[in-house]
Amino acid sequence: MAVFKLIKPAPLTEKVQSRQGNIYLYRAMWLIGWIPPKEGVLRYVYLFWTCVPFAFGVFYLPVGFIISYVQEFKNFTPGEFLTSLQVCINVYGASVKSTITYLFLWRLRKTEILLDSLDKRLANDSDRERIHNMVARCNYAFLIYSFIYCGYAGSTFLSYALSGRPPWSVYNPFIDWRDGMGSLWIQAIFEYITMSFAVLQDQLSDTYPLMFTIMFRAHMEVLKDHVRSLRMDPERSEADNYQDLVNCVLDHKTILKCCDMIRPMISRTIFVQFALIGSVLGLTLVNVFFFSNFWKGVASLLFVITILLQTFPFCYTCNMLIDDAQDLSNEIFQSNWVDAEPRYKATLVLFMHHVQQPIIFIAGGIFPISMNSNITVAKFAFSIITIVRQMNLAEQFQ
């Protein structure tokens, strides 16, 4: 486990920053070509590599799927077509999401600078322990996403290639996989590499919102601890107590600035996913229920898990962030303010008023990002299954 030492909290004697929760995330970004060197010849070599995953994952795959449907539609079995179509729809969404994420990477960097200022406010070992646990939790979550996303790509590749078919049936102008076993495996490996670009780009677009909201929640917990300790030290003067309150207000403003900095980025990527999740999930479940054998079913179920992971954990964290604001308001009200000076009380009232406004992210300026919204858009999957059952479409396509 030494290879993945970042998934365990570092000892309190070791200095840890919030941004270290993104170490695995940024390593994956570096691998896919999103973080070039700042200068030197290697920067230009690296920029060429940046273009390769974009060329295949963002541009070639969406076009390749459509050409394949036009030229090879009559050769598809129902299961192969659904496997290809469910991924095709998701690939279009992933192309948009990864492009948005890449163009707005500067927002992540600026958010980390704001988080650095919050790290400086850690007052004791309890605060540091929360941040250490958060850093480990973020890296652990990214690792789980990596295993599941890569597991889907690998299982689909093997289940179809071993059955004598290309995994996603993407158009390839240079190879006809029907020419023999060698051509089949060349096509399958080419599709796997190309799809791996898209899968990793999609993973990066899906994980950064979760990573950063986990960080925001950790600092909200630290802030709640600081609010609980207000005016609890009898040795501190009223001026010191007032400064402690002001620091809490400033910390809350910094957390709001973090959310505002990353909000336009999250709004766009989650809106794209909300728009697609129902149809992709529905087609995948139809494929599992009616057209898959065991191993292809395993690959499709892994795809279902990846689709659910794209939004559900983040939406749950958004719900918790809303609850954190309410909890913080309660902590402020229950703090030791009764015999405080008028200036302290006036500032406390204003602080509590601002805290009562929950931190909400809006997808595309339309859907509040929450578990309720996620479940609502995901319900469309069951509508697709109902239509297939009532019209006996599965039997007609057998």
From Swiss-Prot:
Expressed in olfactory sensory neurons in the antenna. InterPro entries: 7tm6_olfct_rcpt (IPR004117). GO terms for molecular function: ionotropic olfactory receptor activity; odorant binding; olfactory receptor activity. Glycans are attached at residue 374. Residues 1-46, 106-141, 201-269, 315-348 are cytoplasmic. It comes from the Eukaryota. It holds the Pfam family 7tm_6. Its main location: membrane. GO terms for cellular component: dendrite membrane; membrane; plasma membrane. Keywords: Cell membrane, Glycoprotein, Membrane, Olfaction, Receptor, Sensory transduction, Transducer, Transmembrane, Transmembrane helix. GO terms for biological process: detection of chemical stimulus involved in sensory perception of smell; sensory perception of smell; signal transduction. Odorant receptor which mediates acceptance or avoidance behavior, depending on its substrates. The odorant receptor repertoire encodes a large collection of odor stimuli that vary widely in identity, intensity, and duration. Forms a complex with Orco to form odorant-sensing units, providing sensitive and prolonged odorant signaling and calcium permeability. Also plays a role in the response to N,N-Diethyl-meta-toluamide (DEET), the most widely used insect repellent worldwide. The atypical heteromeric and topological design of the odorant receptors appears to be an insect-specific solution for odor recognition, making the OR/Orco complex an attractive target for the development of highly selective insect repellents to disrupt olfactory-mediated host-seeking behaviors of insect disease vectors. Odor-evoked OR currents are independent of known G-protein-coupled second messenger pathways. Belongs to the insect chemoreceptor superfamily. Heteromeric odorant receptor channel (TC 1.A.69) family. Or2a subfamily. Interacts with Orco. Complexes exist early in the endomembrane system in olfactory sensory neurons (OSNs), coupling these complexes to the conserved ciliary trafficking pathway. This is Odorant receptor 59b. It comes from Drosophila melanogaster. The gene is Or59b.
